[in-house]
Amino acid sequence: MITVALIDDHLIVRSGFAQLLGLEPDLQVVAEFGSGREALAGLPGRGVQVCICDISMPDISGLELLSQLPKGMATIMLSVHDSPALVEQALNAGARGFLSKRCSPDELIAAVHTVATGGCYLTPDIAIKLASGRQDPLTKRERQVAEKLAQGMAVKEIAAELGLSPKTVHVHRANLMEKLGVSNDVELARRMFDGW
């Protein structure tokens, strides 16, 4: 029997996943948590083998939570976003799988079985995005803006240097941050210096 925990701040997602997993004779959902803090308090000692964890939660992000979960538990990250940068971030943080919230029931079940037996699971569409995302995900202009932001330049300075309007620089900044899965200039600089 493979024991599973669900961590998601949306009750309907947890309930739906629990019902789907409960239909499988070798899977048992033994814990459900509505927040990262609840999971940290309730997971230890439950003997959970596989954890399905949402990335976007209000108290602690799933990526932050990943490093604090009990050792020996295989974690599948779950998100509505599946940009290559976000998937890579999750895998680098120790996730053994990544599912989009648009995944099929069969993909959910396959992911749990795969990570429970030591494998890594990505749906084919995410794997393709990840493989193609290993090429530079940014346009030439987005890369220029990213490099300037990482050097600490202000938007107005970047606009003047590249011959763009500040509004255009803001658009490039928003696009590149979404593509790289970062939310501020500090995270962006860290990604730049780590070689993406």
Curated annotation (Swiss-Prot):
Signal peptide: none annotated. The modification 4-aspartylphosphate is found at D54. Phosphorylated and dephosphorylated by UhpB. The keyword Cytoplasm applies. Residues 155-174 bind DNA. It holds the Pfam family Response_reg. Phosphorylation by UhpB enhances DNA binding activity. It is found in: Cytoplasm. Keywords: Activator, Cytoplasm, DNA-binding, Phosphoprotein, Transcription, Transcription regulation, Two-component regulatory system. Residues 3-116 form the Response regulatory domain. SUPFAM superfamilies: C-terminal effector domain of the bipartite response regulators, CheY-like. Residues 131-196 form the HTH luxR-type domain. GO terms for cellular component: cytoplasm. GO terms for molecular function: DNA binding. InterPro entries: CheY-like_superfamily, Sig_transdc_resp-reg_C-effctor, Sig_transdc_resp-reg_receiver, Tscrpt_reg_LuxR_C, WalR-like. GO terms for biological process: phosphorelay signal transduction system; regulation of DNA-templated transcription. Part of the UhpABC signaling cascade that controls the expression of the hexose phosphate transporter UhpT. Activates the transcription of the uhpT gene. Acts by binding specifically to the uhpT promoter region. This is Transcriptional regulatory protein UhpA. It comes from Escherichia coli (strain K12).
